[in-house]
Amino acid sequence: MKKLSLIFAALIAAPTAFADTKIELTGNDQMQFNAKTLEAKAGESITLSFKHIGTLPVVAMGHNVVFLKPGTSVPAFAAKCASAKDNGYLPTDDESKAMIVAATKLLGGGQSDEIKFTPTEPGAYPYICTFPGHFAIMQGVLTVK
């Protein structure tokens, strides 16, 4: 009977052990994310829904969300992004690609994108918009516990 109770308890706990964190983030024409801090648990799948709630087109006021590995120098990474227009302002060199945990598409006003990723290690994961000049204002931190 004890074994059956343990199995039943494990089955009840299983769905919460692997719960999916859902995050809704927006960016606007004033170069602002609606959240500067986000939280998740290590090993937990994150579904990020990102919407550009402004009206300006992608060529004038494009926004994305790029999550970087803990310890990444945001200014150095953003400097490489500025010259990567043909790739949605995401650098293509191996060193930079290794710093990226997850990234949405570059969006214009009214557009949205959804990504899924799973941070496996605890830490402070910076996130930024890589459109030229935006990272100085459009950045935050995903704290993974």
Where are these regions (language model features)?
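Extracellular/periplasmic metallocenter environments
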Residues: 102-145
